[in-house]
Curated annotation (Swiss-Prot):
Keywords: Cell membrane, Disulfide bond, G-protein coupled receptor, Glycoprotein, Membrane, Receptor, Transducer, Transmembrane, Transmembrane helix. Residues 94-109, 167-189, 259-295, 357-447 are cytoplasmic. In adults, expression in thorax and/or abdomen. PROSITE patterns: G_PROTEIN_RECEP_F1_1 (PS00237), G_PROTEIN_RECEP_F1_2 (PS50262). This is Neuropeptides capa receptor. Disulfide bonds join 142-228. Glycans are attached at residues 2, 13. Residues 1-72, 131-145, 211-237, 317-335 are extracellular. GO terms for biological process: body fluid secretion; cellular response to desiccation; G protein-coupled receptor signaling pathway; neuropeptide signaling pathway; positive regulation of calcium ion transport. Belongs to the G-protein coupled receptor 1 family. GO terms for cellular component: basolateral plasma membrane; membrane; plasma membrane. It holds the Pfam family 7tm_1.
Length: 477
């Protein structure tokens, strides 16, 4: 969390002992017309020195050693796993040309945004537990960190939503997906969401600054109280937190639930249809189909749960800060939420590579090659079907044991670029094993049709031809 994305910094950090109410009282008391009374600071008859006053409002300059060490260890583990995981995703996508797909471009964008946020946000966050005030980095760093951290947060949310939309179209509306398929479209979308995210984060960068407490007796500024935050007055007057909550949590959460719920229902429906057709087959195929269905649905559920768990505490804390400062035990609740929200917020940067990448067999093989130095690169051009989604059920060779060949009468209908000229349309007519060196995109049909290709085009044109209905069951992005 940071000076702008986290409400705790707008209230001087939830770990500070008497943060929100006393801080706002301080801001008001800087006006000479506002009389200072015992109710404002509860500092007795106010015999406090400036140093004692700062300690009363902001809490201790350094948190207890056990807490600082524990948080450093936990956040250090999050930092290492998050940086390593996201770096591996980026390196794998860059190194292997077979990974240059629309889906992986979204994953690359997500990994970069998570990396930037971890690098700019987490070290400073840990430092605050050891030295809460005065701020040592200055106003430029305060603004830059607030701006970049907020922007990267928005990029992550937008990327997850865009990625979910791609999956939804591929699974539920494959005929519509073909009209939009292509790397350039994915790059344009990613570029647009980065631009929109950075524009949306500009107010947080502009409004964040070094804030100070004012000594109530003479209204002088206490230099030792410097901290990076948005002005409490601005937070109360401009609904930055409310807008952020609606646009970057409520709406994305609703979209993700609807999209993945629809995808889960579609996968379940198709699996049940297959089981009905396969009643005469052996029980092993039925069990395998059921296992694949459960695996995919669990992954879909994991996406929704992960998004909610990682982001809800963060936004809940903002809302409590804005609307529940007068509730009983507010400070205790806010301090607990600070720890929970901070942990969940940064854990999302670590979990994303797992949820969206590591669950894919292709990524697991690539990671083993990268970490262990094993020469398994041939996997990417071997007999496995393209595995561009973490929801991949199986390879083409595992699912289709024999297919039949015929020449396509209209090959040009399938061309999407000049590199796609060496494709063969295969239809069930004569028995022929699927070549193990085929790089294929699986298309579920009533009469099996598979397109073998040697290009980077990742989704073939859905087609209705005679008695053939080509329906894309899995993501072909």
């Amino acid at each position: 969390m940071n000076s702008s994305t986290d409400p705790t910094f707008s209230e001087l950090n939830a770990s500070f002992t008497n943060t929100p109410d006393t801080l706002f009282a301080t801001s008001v008391s800087s006006d000479p017309s506002h009389g200072f009374g015992e109710e404002d600071y509860a500092c007795g008859t106010f015999n406090c020195s400036p140093k004692e006053f700062v300690a009363f409002v902001l809490g201790p300059q350094t948190l207890p050693l056990y807490k600082a060490v524990l948080i450093t260890i936990i956040f250090g583990g999050i930092f290492i796993t998050g940086v390593v995981g996201n770096l591996l995703v980026c390196i794998v996508i860059i190194r292997h040309s077979a990974m240059h797909t629309a889906t992986n471009y979204y994953l690359f964008s997500l990994a970069v945004s998570d990396l930037l946020y971890l690098l700019f946000g987490l070290p400073t966050e840990v430092f605050l537990y050891w030295h809460q005030y005065p701020d040592l980095f200055g106003m430029p760093f305060c603004k830059i960190r607030a701006f970049i951290s907020e922007a990267c947060t928005y990029v992550s949310v937008f990327t997850i939503v865009a990625f979910s939309m791609e999956r939804f179209l591929a699974i539920c509306h494959p005929l519509h997906l073909y009209a939009m398929v292509g790397f350039k479209r994915a790059i344009r979308i990613i570029t647009a969401l980065w631009i929109v995210s950075f524009i949306s984060a500009i107010p947080f960068g502009l409004l964040s600054d070094i804030q100070y407490l004012n000594y109530p007796l003479d209204h002088s500024r206490i230099e030792e109280s410097a901290f990076c935050s948005m002005s409490p007055k601005i937070v109360n007057e401009i609904p930055v937190f409310e807008v952020s909550f609606c646009i970057f949590f409520v709406i994305p959460m609703i979209l993700i639930i609807l999209l993945y719920g629809r995808m889960g229902a579609k996968i379940r429906s198709r699996t049940n249809q297959k089981l009905g057709v396969q009643q005469g087959t052996n029980n092993r195929e039925t069990r395998n189909s059921q296992m694949r269905k459960k695996t995919v649905i669990r992954m879909l559920a994991a996406v929704v749960i992960t998004f909610f768990v990682c982001w809800f505490p963060f936004h809940l804390q903002r809302l409590i800060f804005l609307y529940a400062k007068n509730m009983d035990n507010y400070l205790d609740i806010n301090e607990a939420l600070f720890s929970i929200a901070g942990f969940a917020y940064y854990v999302s940067c670590t979990v994303n590579p797992i949820v969206y990448s590591v669950m894919s067999r292709r990524y697991r093989v690539a990671f083993r090659e990268l970490l262990c130095g094993k020469a398994v690169g041939a996997y990417y051009n071997s007999g496995f079907a393209r595995d561009h989604s973490s929801f991949r059920e199986s390879s083409a060779y595992d699912r289709v044991h024999s297919v039949h060949v015929r020449a396509s009468q209209h090959p040009n209908k399938f061309e999407t670029d000049s590199s796609s000229a060496n494709r063969v349309l295969i239809k069930k007519t004569y028995s022929l094993p699927l070549p193990k060196n085929a790089d294929s995109t699986v298309l579920s049909t009533t009469d099996i049709v598979i397109v073998l290709e040697n290009s980077h085009t990742v989704c073939e044109e859905p087609k209705v031809e005679n008695d053939i209905w080509i329906e894309n069951e899995e993501t072909c992005i």
